[in-house]
From Swiss-Prot:
This is Translation initiation factor IF-3. Residues 158-195 are annotated as: Disordered. It comes from Prochlorococcus marinus (strain MIT 9515). Its main location: cytoplasm. It comes from the Bacteria. Keywords: Cytoplasm, Initiation factor, Protein biosynthesis. IF-3 binds to the 30S ribosomal subunit and shifts the equilibrium between 70S ribosomes and their 50S and 30S subunits in favor of the free subunits, thus enhancing the availability of 30S subunits on which protein synthesis initiation begins.
Length: 195
């Protein structure tokens, strides 16, 4: 018995679009390239009309009774569909969870660096997981870690909102921040406007 191949070497089967001669329905509801209804027409007559106009007969909806076809330039239609799909992929941003790690005994410069990282992640539209790591007996000072995380949330108040308040998880304390959808109006600016 010959050994089984590890993977299928055949090219994937491409699903060809139902255009022109590939349409097998005898009766079709035909729509003109301008959007005008031509009515229910025999398939051969619809193909003749499309050929006279030097356009393609494209099956738009085969679930309708009779199936709906449109006379159009298929190459242009395909290009526009690909362009729309590409734009949709561009606009859909997958939000990721980025992590900022620190110890509760963090120096000022290191803290500022973590704030800068968090701001960069939030501006990119990602959520931020702020983690304070405990080593050994440091876990006894979880109140200091909570204070640090709340200070961080306060410093990032303009760019983010707290999604999950600080809580202990094993030997870490974590807090989740998500990007602020509406800009925060500072209380100081409100006080100046009222005066």
């Amino acid at each position: 018995m010959p050994p089984r191949p590890r993977f299928d070497r055949r090219a994937p089967v491409r699903e060809l679009p139902n255009i022109n001669e590939r349409i097998k329905y005898p009766q079709l509801r035909v729509v003109d390239s301008d959007g005008k209804q031509l009515g229910v027409i025999d398939r051969i007559k619809a193909l003749e009309i499309a050929n006279q106009r030097e356009l393609d007969l494209v099956l738009v909806s085969e679930k309708a009774n009779p199936p709906v076809c449109r006379i159009m330039d298929y190459g242009k239609y395909k290009f526009e569909q690909e362009k729309k799909a590409k734009e949709a992929r561009k606009k859909s941003h997958q939000t990721e969870v980025k992590e900022v790690k620190m110890r509760y005994k963090i120096d000022k410069h290191d803290y500022d660096v973590r704030i800068g990282q968090a701001v960069r992640f939030l501006k990119a539209g990602d959520k931020v997981k702020c983690t304070v790591i405990f080593r050994g007996r440091e876990i006894q000072h979880s109140n200091l870690a909570e204070t640090l995380l709340l200070r961080m949330a306060n410093d990032l108040e303009e760019q983010s909102e707290v999604q999950q308040r600080p809580k202990r998880e094993g030997r870490n304390m974590i807090m989740f921040l998500s990007p602020r959808k509406t800009p925060l109006i500072k209380k100081e600016e409100d006080a100046k406007e009222n005066n």
